[in-house]
Structures are given as structure tokens and as C-alpha cells.
């Protein structure tokens, strides 16, 4: 397992040097952020990013993400051209030696929260989705701008996209468009040596009348059966799936591990109910997820891949502008998960490897 950390490029207030100082940190999860959605990523852009990360003593373990254009999701006539561009990006990621691409197939926006600073009992704040906040709200009729929405759209464009989904695209239509996309890109991913890892819908249930399809156990089974290859895998985001109390994330994790189809791990904890959900500290007791149980499964199945602590509370005066992506709580989470990993590895009679090659610099006796 390679502990990894999301980094938003040169504009991220969290620096690579700060990330490198987290004990046991090996990988960076990042993307090319200056290429418009739908265009192919040039190889030189990827190599420049890779060099920057490697000069800091880290490696890019996952690209998160190459966004899927809405016209692909909606099955529009120009989707083949857009898919060819996507395939070019996959080839270039493979040529750069990066093994995994995380992506999603969520309509319009990547994730939705109603509150970025909801208080927790420990005095910190975190991201929350409170259904009561959105009761009776319509993003088409109301002047609404929620966290996680794609800022590349104007409000009028976003309203048009939402209306098209509502009127013309059912969940089965979205499934059909996803299948078309998967069957088009997977041979390229296999040839390039890149494993694809679809992220679940966040939250994993319908909102605003939009179709949502990657939501739970049955959806994961259906998705994996679209194309039978280890390159067609999932991002096991336990926090996203656990945001719906109906999902048994331990059972889902074991199912996907048995099929060797977890290509990336996101680990955040949540507490959830009929009211919605709130993200918590990573500790098992802080939320609904048995995090030790999750890590034990990874060890039991000898899972080899990148895991990143996903989202963090706002603590210790963290002023990051990207919700959930401050340094401090994610660093605590990384250390916590490395501790769980070492404990479970040693209990299984195995020796964990955190990639630490040099234990000191200079004269040990000085």
C-alpha cells in the first residue's frame, strides 16, 4: 500500500515539501489543471508535472482526475471525438509511467455539500450534506450555487444541462452512455498499462431530479460486469458509499477485493442518517465506518495500491481555500491509516514498507 496525498498543483497552498514531511508519505494524487475539459492532455504537461513531484522526493501514484465531458455522459453526437481525446490522455498518462486514473460519471458536478463549515462536537468544522437545507430548492428555478459544482459553466449553461438530464436522460440512459464510454476506452487503457478507477456518486443517491448510478453494491457489480478487466476498476471511497446508511462498506470492499478491482482507495469517515451526512475525523469511533476493518481487509487480500486520506476537518487555523483539503487533518489521517496498516501487517506476520530508504542525514553521532 502506498500512502498518497491529493495535491492541486502549484496553486495549492499545501506544498510538496509539507506533504513529503508526513511520516510514510510516498505518493501524490494530482492532475493537469490547465487543459479544458474535453481536450487531450499533452504528454509534455504530464511529464512536467511528474518531474515537479519527483524532484520533491515523491511519485505520482494516481491521476485524479481526467474529467469526462458532459456531452459524453449525455450521449451527444460529438461524443466520439471527445472520447478519442480522452483516449489520447490515457495513452499519455501511461507513457509517463503513471498507473491509475480516477474519474467519475456524475452529471453536472463532482460532489455536493450544503455546508462547508458544519460544527463537530470537538470544536472543529467539516463538510456536511443536510437534506433540510435543500428542501424545496431547485437549481434551475433558484439562483443556486453549491460547493462542488463545475465553475466552468455559466449559471445559464448549468441550468440548460440540468434540464436536459431531467427531461431526456434516465438512469438507464446514463448507464447506456457509461457502457459506451467504458467499452470505447478500456482497450486503450489496457494497452497503455493504465488502470481506471471510477469514483462513486457523492452523495450516492439522487438529488435535484438528476440520475445517479454508481451508488452501492448492485451498481458496483453491474459496473464491473460492463467490461471484465482489472483495468476496469473502482475507487473504493468508503466515505462516499457510507453516506447512504444502506451501504455496507466492509462487504462492498471485500467484494471488490475478491475480484481484484479496487484500483484506488479513498478513506474518510462520516456519520449518516435520513437527515443526510457529515464528514468526521478519520478515527473509527468518530463516525460510522470501521476503518480498522477496512484496512484489515486490504492487508488480508494483499492489496497493492494507492490510498489517500480523503477530506479533513478544518482544524488549527487552517485557512485553505479548497474545502476538505487542508494539510493538518489529512496529515493526521495519513498517520492514522499508516498505523492501522502497520498493526494489521504485523498481526498477519508481514513487514510493512513505507518507502523509507534513509533514516537520517549526516553523522548519526553528531
From Swiss-Prot:
<dbReference type="InterPro" id="IPR004628">
    <property type="entry name" value="Man_deHydtase"/>
</dbReference>
<keyword id="KW-0464">Manganese</keyword>
<dbReference type="GO" id="GO:0042840">
    <property type="term" value="P:D-glucuronate catabolic process"/>
</dbReference>
<comment type="similarity">
    <text>Belongs to the mannonate dehydratase family.</text>
</comment>
<keyword id="KW-0408">Iron</keyword>
<comment type="function">
    <text>Catalyzes the dehydration of D-mannonate.</text>
</comment>
<comment type="pathway">
    <text>Carbohydrate metabolism; pentose and glucuronate interconversion.</text>
</comment>
<dbReference type="GO" id="GO:0008927">
    <property type="term" value="F:mannonate dehydratase activity"/>
</dbReference>
<protein>
    <recommendedName>
        <fullName>Mannonate dehydratase</fullName>
        <ecNumber>4.2.1.8</ecNumber>
    </recommendedName>
</protein>
<dbReference type="GO" id="GO:0008198">
    <property type="term" value="F:ferrous iron binding"/>
</dbReference>
<dbReference type="GO" id="GO:0030145">
    <property type="term" value="F:manganese ion binding"/>
</dbReference>
<dbReference type="Pfam" id="PF03786">
    <property type="entry name" value="UxuA"/>
</dbReference>
<keyword id="KW-0456">Lyase</keyword>
<dbReference type="InterPro" id="IPR036237">
    <property type="entry name" value="Xyl_isomerase-like_sf"/>
</dbReference>
